Structures are given as C-alpha cells and as structure tokens.
Curated annotation (Swiss-Prot):
PROSITE patterns: BARWIN_3. GO terms for biological process: defense response to bacterium; defense response to fungus. This is Punein. Residues 1-20 form the Barwin domain. The lineage of its organism: Eukaryota, Viridiplantae, Streptophyta, Embryophyta, Tracheophyta. InterPro entries: Barwin_dom (IPR001153). The N-terminus is blocked.
C-alpha cells in the first residue's frame, strides 16, 4: 500500500492497508 507523505513531499509505502 502507498500513501502520500506531505511532511516529506513524497509517496511512502506501508504494510498497513487500513491507512488512508
């Protein structure tokens, strides 16, 4: 799962599929 990280201005990957 990937999500955008506005604090670091890039996309991040996570195992947590429940993350928005």
């Amino acid at each position: 799962y990937h999500y955008y990280n506005p604090e670091e201005n890039h996309f991040c990957a996570t195992w947590d599929a429940s993350k928005p």
